[in-house]
Amino acid sequence: KSKISKELEVFYNPIMKLNRDTSILLLNLIKDKEMQLALPLAGSGIRGIRFLKELKKNKIKNISFNDYGSIKHIKQNIKLNELEKDSKLKLSSKDANLFLLESKGFDYIDIDPFGSPNQFLDNAIIRISRNGILAVTATDTSALSGSHESACIRKYYAKPLRNELMHEVGIRILIRKVQLIGA
């Protein structure tokens, strides 16, 4: 089990455990591929720590933890989990877009910002490898679920629904935005 410091100044959302669980399941299902993984907005580092501890040993070629403001906390959590000597680890403290632009590319990129992922999509798509996986999380659910219709239209070029289908439609709007940027 992964450990995380209780004295974090960075955002850690325990409710997103299912999201992290799904990432691990997905990556473990990929056959015979040693992957380069990137976490441009690593936050507390918990997702990457779980990757190192829970993915099959031959899955990770290297894993890049990046976060402009919390690399100190990522290092603390890596040490807490006794992973500081892992040669697959790469740490950096750059703006997420700069981190992506300066890289050579990755097989898996996880974009998990606070709010909309839009400002990171262009560079993530540029740096994802052929047949790579781009994981995108959006926490601006008020826009995507229709509470703030004008924000959704402005950010995602789509009109959300405010009914029993709002969450399904919100996911579809986000997927379509990623498709538009990647096209």
List the predicted regions and their residue ranges.
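SAM-dependent transferase fold signal centered on methyltransferase-like domains
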Residues: 1-183
